[in-house]
């Protein structure tokens, strides 16, 4: 063993000590004797100021002081030995160290980027899972609310059908009253008494209640349609895939056009039958009037003229567009039917989407179960193979021991 190893010194410490010794010797050689120092002290201040120090002396003194401070710091364990090596090495060595540090920096940066990308992928998977769960919940709630809207619209449709039937019954009294008021100038007292008797059976409160009920039903139908629109736009905007979303959008946008077309193409046959019934009743009344009032020919002629005008007006109403024969309640009834059809279409789209999603989840679960079963089978086979290998090796070891 060498002396340095015995003392426990490393090669770097030995080199630093040698450098320090060389620098100290150079400092002693350059230092002036004590006599020169005393003479320099005795010299006047003007002369001392005029003799400047050499530049090399200044630089060497700075280098020596820096090296001494570094050596002291090494002894006190304040700075590692690598600092001295970096200061004393050449420019090439410093360049090599810099490149090495750059490589380490880039490797660390790559590791950080890879970790960030992996973390982002995990977060994206979790976000997709949460989005799928939330979209499923939204679609389920939307389907439940659409079923409630479907039930409400079906109830309103039945109510509107009753109101339309009542409206088709009540106009008979109004038309008969109007016809009789127009022909009242040519009728006698007996016909006026019959009109009074007929008007006594007509109840106006029923008409008022029917009108109020129709207004309430109309408001409820319109409010239900608005709620359905807001509900679909809220729950199915980001939850449905693209083909289903386009189908829902198309069904929503086609509701006004479908309602308009159905209103202008719908003809209520009940009105025509009522018109024919009115004509037959008027003919019977004319025959009775002719039998009773044979003497009043002039009045009968006026009645015939008026009846012809009424027939012309009624024929014109029948030949007019079918939308003129549709009442307000009939239009609301058509709106409710079209809205009900739209709701059913949206329900079908949402239900089919949920069914496809459930089938996809089942397929994924089946694939995972298959992979898990295969993995377990492979593990069992591997363990059995290990057991066979171990049973085969053990007898050989026993035989070797017995031979020994």
Swiss-Prot record:
Residues with the Phosphoserine modification: 10
Q: Does the keyword Transport apply?
A: no
Oligomeric form and interacting partners: Interacts with SCS2.
**Coordinates of motif FFAT in the sequence?**
200-206
- Low complexity bias spans: 378-387
**Region (Disordered): which ranges?**
25-51, 170-201, 305-327, 378-404
Which residue ranges does the record annotate as region Basic motif?
A: 109-138
Cellular compartments per GO CC: endoplasmic reticulum; nuclear envelope; nuclear membrane; nuclear periphery; nucleoplasm; nucleus
Polar residues: bias regions: 26-37, 394-404
Give its localization: Endoplasmic reticulum; Nucleus
Organism expressing this protein natively = Saccharomyces cerevisiae (strain ATCC 204508 / S288c)
Look up keyword Lipid metabolism and say if it applies.
yes
Q: Outline what the protein does.
A: Negative regulator of the transcriptional complex INO2-INO4 in response to phospholipid precursor availability. When precursors become limiting, OPI1 is retained at the endoplasmic reticulum (ER) and INO2-INO4 activates INO1 and other genes required for phospholipid biosynthesis, whereas abundant precursor availability results in targeting of OPI1 to the nucleus to repress transcription of these genes.
**What's the record's remark on domains?**
The FFAT motif is required for interaction with SCS2 and proper localization of the protein.
Remarks, miscellaneous: Present with 1281 molecules/cell in log phase SD medium.
For this protein, the parts annotated as crossing the membrane are: none
Query: Which residues fall in a compositionally biased region of kind Acidic residues?
Result: 186-201
What domain of life does the UniProt record list for this protein's source?
Eukaryota
| Residue segments, region Leucine-zipper | 139-160
Q: Name one GO molecular function term.
A: transcription corepressor activity
Key words of the record: DNA-binding, Endoplasmic reticulum, Lipid biosynthesis, Lipid metabolism, Nucleus, Phospholipid biosynthesis, Phospholipid metabolism, Phosphoprotein, Repressor, Transcription, Transcription regulation
GO biological process, alphabetically ordered: cellular response to phosphate starvation; endoplasmic reticulum unfolded protein response; negative regulation of phospholipid biosynthetic process; negative regulation of transcription by RNA polymerase II; phospholipid biosynthetic process; positive regulation of transcription by RNA polymerase II; regulation of transcription by RNA polymerase II
Q: What is this protein called?
A: Transcriptional repressor OPI1
Where is this chain primarily localised?
endoplasmic reticulum
